[in-house]
Design a protein with these regions (language model features):
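Helix N-cap/beta->alpha junction signal
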Residues: 13-15
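C-terminal accessory helical subdomains adjacent to catalytic cores in phosphodiester-
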Residues: 1-8, 19-36, 51-65, 72-176
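Eukaryotic endosomal/vacuolar membrane-trafficking regulators centered on PX-domain-mediated PI3P pathways
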Residues: 42-48
Length: 178
């Protein structure tokens, strides 16, 4: 029986916490996917790497997915029109089927996603004070958490199944109000 080829996934992140979380996923799911070491940077970085870096360019035809892990409202993503063009270009690097591009976006801050690993919450995350409150709530659940800390990020990531359930719950609430 032929061995199944694992999907190849490249990940681009904006912050240290996202990088640590992705490293956890890479180790946790190494039996089902080849997740490359995450790179700090988003759309322009990915575009440049797949155009100029031989490691990326030469693997484009065997790349299954490209993930972008970022906060939506921090202003670092730039123009959505420009992003859409880059995503379209990246998808077409592989002929058939195209590369699947996933936008793993958090609203406000990644700590909101991390908090969903513990409980169902729908906090306001508009101001700096509200983001600091999310951080405090997360630290109540995972004492010692600071952005980019590998140990606490891994403790949080261990609860990824609960985060998925709680995230679906949050999305269900937002659909009710449409």
């Amino acid at each position: 029986m032929a061995r199944k080829i694992k999907p190849l996934i490249y990940v681009f992140c904006e912050g240290e916490s996202e990088i640590e979380y992705t490293k956890y996923l890479k180790e946790k799911f190494e039996d089902v996917a080849v997740i490359q070491k995450p790179v700090k940077g988003l759309f322009e970085v990915a575009d440049k790497k797949f155009k100029k870096d031989a490691k990326y360019r030469n693997n484009a035809e065997v790349t299954d997915e490209i993930w972008f892990f970022f906060d939506v409202d921090d202003g670092q993503t730039g123009s959505w029109d420009r992003i859409q063009k880059i995503v379209s270009t990246l998808k077409k690097l592989r002929k058939k089927p195209n590369i699947r591009v996933r936008l793993l976006m958090t609203t406000g801050c990644v700590e909101f996603w991390f908090l969903l690993h513990y409980k169902k919450v729908v906090p306001s995350i508009q101001t700096v004070a509200e983001k600091e409150n999310i951080l405090r709530l997360l630290q109540n659940e995972c004492p010692g958490y600071v952005k980019g800390d590998s140990n606490t990020t891994r403790k949080i990531a261990d609860h990824f199944k609960q985060a998925s359930i709680n995230g679906d719950w949050v999305l269900g609430l937002s659909l009710i109000h449409i």
